[in-house]
Every structure is written in structure tokens, then in C-alpha cells.
Amino acid sequence: MTEYLVPYANAESEFEEKRSRFISHVFLVESEAEARARIDEMKKKYYDARHNCWCFVLHDGTVRYGDDGEPQGTAGQPMLNVFQRENVENVVCIVTRYFGGILLGAGGLTRAYAKAAKDALDAAGKARMQPFSVLLLECPYPMFERIKLLIEGHEGRIESNDYGAAVTLTFLLPVQKTADFSAALTEISGGQMSAEEVEQRFLPGARE
């Protein structure tokens, strides 16, 4: 599985340029159908806007963009260039423009749409898709907080807790961190605790 960058989160950004209002959204998607559904969602939300321009880039190589009535090459392509330059995939970006009555010109539009896409990406952040181990660990209650901190310290995250005689934790850990985590767990538990890997998943990691 090859690592690649995706948006860390969905995000929104907004700015005004010569009385035109630009509202940009970035979403993490996994398919063209999902990307187009997000585009349709934003077009319905901002149905009264002059333009809802968009682009998306998928890990499978699919690349699409639309200018939605803006002069050709002044909206979707500059937006797309932002994500290709940043090497971000599995992303869809929609930029809504409410026209303010002042023409921006081709150069002004190109800069504005590129800025809108970059602002939304900066708000979303980036994460690297990477292999994660899904682990199970039975933890005595007095050790719970220490184990929680240990997981977080190794860039892991807890998926669920099952409270019984002890706490059974289901958590995710980057594969490259599992050996260090296991060694630290053995040390703090005096060799009494070990985590069991149940599967591996390919998921976004920490924000970069």
C-alpha cells in the first residue's frame, strides 16, 4: 500500500475580493460518485450564487474540474493546480462566488479561485494515508490513564472501550509504531500486558 496525502478534515473558508464573496469547501472523498454528490450538495446549498466552481483529484488518477460559467481556465483549473502542487488526493473542492458587481478580469479570477482553494486546504490540513494496526488490549482499571497516554504518545487513537472486569480497548496504531509501543507496554506493565493485532487498515494519519 503506497502512502499518499489527503485532507485531514473537511473544511470551509471565505474571503471577499472587490465585493465578490468567495466561499470554499474541501471534502475528503473516496470515489467520483462521492465527489459529485458533494458538488451537488454545495450547488443546492448555494443555489442563489452566480457560480459554484469545482475540482476533484482521486488516488486512482481521476481528475475533473468545472468552471460553472466563469471564463474557461479561470476557476476549476487554478483550483485543481493547488491540489496537484500540494500532492493532495481523494479531495473535492467547491468554490462558490457571489458576484459583487465589479469585474475581476481573467487574472483576478484565476488568483481568487486559487486563493480560495488554498485557504480551504490550509483550513483542512493534510494527513498521510498509511497502514494502521487495529489492536485489542485488556487493561486493568488502575492502568487505564497510563495506557491511554501511551497510545496517544505513539500517534494512536482509541476506537472503543468495553468495560467489564477490566477495560478492553480497541485502538488504532500506525504499523511503524507498533514495535515501539509493544516494548513500552511491556516495560510499564512489567511484562503482564500485550496487545493483539486483529487486522490492518489503510487510514489517514496525524495532521501534518
Question: Over which residues does each language-model region extend?
Answer:
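Conserved short beta-strand edge segments in small beta-sheet-based binding/regulatory domains
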Residues: I158-D162, S189-A206
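Active-site beta-strand/loop microenvironment that shapes enzyme catalytic pockets
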Residues: M79-A123
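Positively charged, aromatic-enriched nucleic acid-contacting surfaces
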Residues: G61, P71-V88, Y163-A165
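Short amphipathic alpha-helices in soluble, non-transmembrane regions
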Residues: I147-E152, D180-S189
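Terminal, non-globular segments
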Residues: F171-D180
